[in-house]
A protein has these predicted regions:
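Residues that cap or anchor secondary-structure elements
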Residues: 6, 19-242, 249-253
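A sequence-level/structural motif corresponding to short, flexible coil/turn segments enriched
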Residues: 75-77, 84-86, 154, 215, ...
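Bacterial N-terminal signal peptides
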Residues: 7-16
Length: 702
């Protein structure tokens, strides 16, 4: 018989604490270490596990957690104790991590502690009768589940704090623990009802204060079914003005700040004081090739509550940004399309002049959003010429792909220097100063070809995906698929370091149409997604979904190993979709991310009411097109998480990024009831359509 438990997810945040009697915000206490190390004598013997981060340490003991917080010369200890609990529960580390901890203190080897194992979770079994406690950590938050087995009484769960000054429940249901120089925030307990592989959100629980003690108040729930809380909706906000706004791409820095790029036709889009361009200059009526409005770039704080900077970029014509990349200093690299003769360019760049139709642009914005480090056109006069994907290498060189026609600038010795059709894909590598092209080449055959996305590996090879209708698209002998099987097929091409030859190139498709929207590279392997209309798309045995879901198109996910040949180079390929349509949107180009372990994170849009979901934040479609957010395991055979994201109007996921603190999504919504979180930067729908930015906390099915 399957286990049935009640799980309460609670989360304490160490950041964004407020001074007593003041609205001022304290900088974060630091990032929580995403691991727990077992105590092997490196600390007090009463401690079972500990988790260290800049400015604090968490010590897990038999029935309490001790938070030791430090800022400068100030320090404070706060203890959370589970009252009346089992004094000797079984305590186990779960999900061993590859890293080990070593302590070399002093010059006596007998005092050293080495090869201490680390874990991503710590489980307390039977901390109360038939009730377990599970701790998690990510970079900025400590989370714990309280798991209540069938017929156990959740009312016996009770905890208290020592070292705090006061407790209160905020208007949004969070528990606030006042300390000497701020507050610790415990998010309100979230509940989900499990029914097989699907989870249905239930009304949230709440905290009840009884003097200095804290208990849970829970809604009615079906005691015959599993009740769980996975995962957290970290934040969700609208982003826009009174007209149209759409987020096309997103990137996240190591601290958890989200950078969003897209387009807007709103003259009142929220630009910030001191940003590069604070006023709108775009063309809302005469846009050529569908390029209207201005680019926007917005940087949000880690809580999604405040805009750090937000700027327009554009001239008197139309612009749109489709790709964004970040360097280690927080500078943002952008690409897209412009038809503005006065698009902002900087001195000494490769191409300072616009053709007057549509041009590719590449712009490097500084870390404060206040000035352009460089900005250049790329292209001379092709109809519909745009940049769709951008990537940077460790030296700051920018790699761009998109579509272009005859006359697009190429470099001597490049793979293909002439376009012999209406439009080809292209790959251009700009030097770190933006003053010249290290190489620039067309990529395609004798018919229509588009480059949609690009990634760069550590050796400087460029991985490109897109689509081709050419019967002679260039493939390599080691390709998985040498020839076009339908009207339009996706492709994956790997260019050598100087853009002169293909290291690997394959088509990918069935008898219908396919496009490649996004590519990522991890340990030399290529991961891509897009849409397919082929029931015979080449899926692999054991993949998550081996049959076409229905409708006009499904999403797909594929992993390719260019070091192998033929069928061996297709590591896995799977459909992803229900009985409706998926990913039929030309501007969903930044919709895949990959973590270091090879897990894949996806967004897009679906009309399917039976789209595959697991542990959702939203279990059912809101209507029309809804965004989806999905995580696949490294084998491509199992969902780790999947959810709808949207309201009663149409919603499109257009960009996704992953950091260990969570999954970050941007896109476009037409829903006045798109889900937002309390305290979000913009909680109300203000335009014809708005961009959205959503973070989903990283607590996925293991």
């Amino acid at each position: 018989m399957p286990s049935r438990v009640l799980s309460l997810l609670c989360m304490v945040s160490f950041g964004a604490a407020a001074y007593a009697g003041s609205a001022k915000t304290i900088p974060s206490y630091g990032q929580v270490s995403p691991s727990f190390e077992v105590n092997r004598g490196q600390t007090d013997a009463r401690v079972e596990f500990l988790s260290r981060g800049p400015g604090y340490t968490v010590f897990l003991m038999s029935n309490q957690a001790v938070l030791s917080l430090k800022r400068g010369t100030r320090s404070q200890t706060v203890t959370m104790r589970f009252a009346g609990s089992n004094a000797r529960p079984s305590i186990t580390g779960l999900h061993s991590l590859p890293g080990k901890t070593n302590y070399f203190i002093g010059n006596e080897p007998r005092n050293w502690r080495t090869n201490i194992p680390t874990y991503s979770e710590v489980l307390y079994r039977h901390i109360y009768p038939s009730i377990d406690l599970l701790y998690h950590a990510n970079q900025r938050q400590l989370e714990f589940d309280v798991r209540v087995a069938p017929h156990a009484d959740p009312n016996i769960i009770e905890f208290s704090f020592t070292g705090s000054r006061a407790l209160r429940v905020a208007d949004n249901g969070d528990l606030l623990v006042t300390i000497d120089d701020g507050e610790l925030r415990f998010c309100r307990p979230h509940l989900y009802q499990s029914r097989g592989a699907r989870r249905q959100a239930l009304p949230d629980g709440s905290y009840v204060l009884i003097g200095e003690r804290v208990k849970f108040s829970l809604p009615s729930y079906d005691r015959t079914q599993t009740l769980v809380i996975d995962p957290m909706l970290g934040y969700s906000t609208f982003l826009g003005g009174s007209a149209d706004s759409f987020g096309n791409a997103i990137a996240v820095d190591s601290a958890g700040h989200a950078y969003v790029a897209g387009g807007t036709t709103s003259s009142d889009f929220p630009a910030t004081s001191g940003s590069y361009q604070q006023t709108y200059g775009g063309d809302n009526g005469g846009g050529y090739q569908g390029v209207i409005g201005d680019v926007f770039v917005t940087k949000l704080d880690v809580a999604g509550r405040r805009v750090i900077y937000s700027t327009y970029i554009g001239g008197s014509g139309g612009e749109d940004a489709y790709g964004i990349a970040l360097d280690a200093s927080g500078n943002a690299y952008l690409t897209g399309g412009t038809n503005s003769l006065d698009f902002p360019v900087t001195p000494g760049v490769w191409q300072p002049v616009c053709c007057g139709l549509t041009d590719v642009f590449v712009t490097k914005l500084n870390s404060t959003g206040s000035s352009l480090i460089y900005s250049t056109h790329v292209g001379v006069g092709g109809e519909g010429t745009r940049g769709f994907g951008i990537a940077i290498d460790g030296k700051g060189a920018a790699y761009v792909t998109g579509n272009a026609g005859p006359g697009f600038p190429t470099t001597p010795g490049a793979l293909k220097t002439e376009c012999n059709c209406f439009t080809d894909g292209y790959v251009t590598k700009l030097n770190p100063q933006g003053s010249n092209a290290d190489y620039s080449t067309f990529l395609g055959g004798s018919s229509v070809d588009f480059g949609e996305a690009i990634a760069v590996d550590t050796t400087g090879k460029a991985f490109v995906t897109g689509y081709s209708s050419s019967g002679d698209f260039p493939t390599t002998p080691s390709a998985f698929q040498l020839t076009n099987k339908g009207g339009v097929d996706a492709f994956v091409s790997v260019l050598n370091q100087n853009g002169s030859a293909l290291a690997y190139s394959t088509l990918l498709g069935g008898s219908g149409n396919e496009e490649g929207y996004k590519i990522a590279v991890n340990h030399g392997k290529a991961y891509l997604t897009g849409y397919t209309g082929s029931t015979d798309f080449p899926v692999t045995a054991g993949a998550l979904q081996t049959t076409y879901g229905g409708g006009s198109s499904d999403a797909y996910v594929a992993k390719i190993d260019p070091s192998k040949s033929g069928s061996a180079s297709l590591v896995y390929a799977t459909f992803l979709g229900g009985s409706g349509d998926e990913n039929l949107n030309d501007f969903q180009r930044d919709i895949l991310a990959v973590d270091n372990a090879g897990n894949v994170y996806l967004t897009g849009a679906t009309t399917s009411t039976d789209f595959p979901i697991l542990h959702p934040t939203q279990a059912t479609s809101g209507g029309g097109w809804d965004a989806y957010v999905t995580a696949l395991d490294k084998t491509g055979s199992r969902l780790r998480f999947s959810t709808y994201l949207g309201g009663s109007g149409d919603d499109f996921g257009r960009g996704i990024a992953f950091q260990s603190g969570g999954i970050y999504i941007t896109g476009q919504t037409y829903s006045v009831d798109f889900p937002t979180t309390s305290g979000a930067f913009q909680s109300g729908f203000t335009g014809t359509s708005d961009a959205f930015v959503t973070k989903i906390g990283n607590k996925l099915s293991q």
